[in-house]
Design a protein with these regions (language model features):
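Glycine-centered signal
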Residues: 73-74
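Metal- and O2-centered redox machinery and metal/ROS homeostasis
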Residues: 1-68, 77-143, 162-279
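Serine residues within intrinsically disordered or low-complexity segments
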Residues: 144-148
Length: 279
């Protein structure tokens, strides 16, 4: 748990401080003017993009456990919830499932940017993690799940084209996948990964709103504390869906909640030249 706390700490050098989770655009649009508005916004974040990230992170942590994740003590544990060949395909179809759940191109770009930065740091902190190595090398092939079918030309429908050799031609895996693999490397499980994803989804937005509006830090912290019960419940639901998705190799079981308001906010923010946060 101590290593997981390190991963969830905002001071962990993974670039998360540069992102507001659309809070900056929400402030610009007048959606957030005070603590009461912030609380409603955090609930929206947690129940949509937060829930999606939690499901993906939990699934990635389960996969990482099957791959062989090096814990904080350096010991490698082997698990067998999925067979070896399926384990090789999991990152590919999870990556596609993440793409399919982010309607805004700006959100996908921000997720991959944060994924790359977190992966760079996590590889230094947990160098013996095989799952992190797989993500770092992009060593995963064509996804083959009912919700991520493969076209006759070799591309995954709805998730972008594949590069030569059937490998995903993307610069970095999504943040939630790296978070799940890093959580497993830190000795945690799917629930820990889901909690970290959910807290990250609301924590970044809360911190950004505090800085942008000069809110009372104690009031903002109280908002986050009030969400603890909801975060625990959402994490449990994410683990249940992730476990079933991995067992059945069916990514459609993962949470897929979205918000058109957040998608549009993400796109508007990306087009702005003057801004404090990258997303």
């Amino acid at each position: 748990m101590t290593a997981l706390a390190l991963l969830a700490d905002s001071r962990f050098p993974s670039g998360g401080h540069a992102h507001s989770g659309s809070a900056e655009e929400a402030v610009s649009q007048g959606w957030i003017t005070g603590v009461a508005d912030l609380e409603r916004f955090l609930l929206l974040r947690m129940s949509t993009s937060g829930a999606v990230a939690a499901g993906l992170a939990a699934a990635a942590a389960i996969w990482a456990g099957a791959t062989g994740a090096t814990g904080a003590t350096g010991a490698t544990e082997e698990h067998d919830p999925i067979d070896r060949m399926a384990a090789c395909r999991v990152p590919g179809w999870l990556d596609c499932e993440a793409d399919a759940r982010m309607a805004a191109p700006a959100s996908r770009a921000a997720s991959r940017t944060q994924g790359r930065l977190l992966l760079h740091t996590a590889r230094r902190v947990w160098p013996r993690s095989r799952a992190l190595e797989v993500l770092d090398r992009g060593a995963f092939g064509v996804p083959s799940t009912p919700s991520s079918p493969v076209r006759p030309d070799g591309g995954a429908t709805g998730a972008g084209a594949l590069g030569a050799g059937g490998r995903l031609s993307r610069s970095a895996p999504h943040h939630s996948l790296v978070l799940g693999a890093a959580a497993a490397a830190a000795g945690s499980d799917g629930h820990g990964a889901a909690v970290a994803a959910l807290y990250g989804a609301v924590g970044a937005a809360a911190t950004a709103a505090l800085r942008l509006l000069g809110l009372d830090p104690m009031a903002v912290t109280s908002c986050l504390a009030a969400l603890c019960t909801e975060i625990d419940a959402a994490a449990a639901a994410a683990v249940a869906s992730a476990t079933m998705a991995i067992e059945r190799s069916d990514g459609s079981i993962l949470p897929s909640h979205g918000s058109i308001e957040l998608d549009l906010a993400s796109q508007r923010h990306a087009r702005k030249e003057m801004k404090l946060f990258a997303s």
